[in-house]
């Protein structure tokens, strides 16, 4: 079959999740947080463009390698059985080629940045590649995802400021904790299928304590975000934004009250608003 026919192009779009931008947005927001803090509200346009493009490319690469890693189990999960690899619309070889194309283009973008950013990028690529395989070996794959989704933070800060002060690691910690919380919501959707096929997740690990642990993670992220605002001497608008974030977290808790799959997925999607509100608070907080 022609590698570039309409059916194949659609399969590649789905492999890269271009049709589902939520993951790109969840990766973009903390990257923008880091850029705005590193630049005190006025990031370099070139760095902003490079990292915005890099977020799209590396999230796409992560999705492709995730589907490659899960190609033999996705067919047994209701939500994923129609993905390109289990449905036969794309091959494993095509997925690997697509992954390397995306990774290479991402690295070419990184090469336009300073040496510290380039050095950090190697760990980022390793995390992106490793995460999909972790759900077979650890009950905390969401922690590895948190590391992978947070690595753009020190990279973006390094690109803008050519330094990694302590505040970077506060943002880093916030995002890891937030990622574990929202990806546990995502994992709650697949919990029954994952138990059947032996895939591990925090949704399974937390079991009946899932809601309270998610709430504690969300509360911890808010406390650290408040500390960040105090250290950066941000104005009152930022702290109003955090109150809104607290309201969004409360709404998510109400949504997942009965652990209904559709509601859990909706709560996961709502985290896009969390990321946006924090960014808006930072944007206005530096004015």
Swiss-Prot record:
It catalyses: all-trans-octaprenyl diphosphate + 4-hydroxybenzoate = 4-hydroxy-3-(all-trans-octaprenyl)benzoate + diphosphate. Its EC number is 2.5.1.39. Pfam families: UbiA. It is found in: Cell inner membrane. Its cofactor is Mg(2+). One of its GO terms (biological process) is ubiquinone biosynthetic process. The chain crosses the membrane at residues 22-42, 45-65, 91-111, 114-134, 139-159, 161-181, 212-232, 236-256, 267-287. GO terms for molecular function: 4-hydroxybenzoate polyprenyltransferase activity. One of its GO terms (cellular component) is plasma membrane. It is an enzyme of class 2 (transferase). The keyword Magnesium applies. Pathway: Cofactor biosynthesis; ubiquinone biosynthesis. Belongs to the UbiA prenyltransferase family. Catalyzes the prenylation of para-hydroxybenzoate (PHB) with an all-trans polyprenyl group. Mediates the second step in the final reaction sequence of ubiquinone-8 (UQ-8) biosynthesis, which is the condensation of the polyisoprenoid side chain with PHB, generating the first membrane-bound Q intermediate 3-octaprenyl-4-hydroxybenzoate. This is 4-hydroxybenzoate octaprenyltransferase. It comes from Psychromonas ingrahamii (strain DSM 17664 / CCUG 51855 / 37).
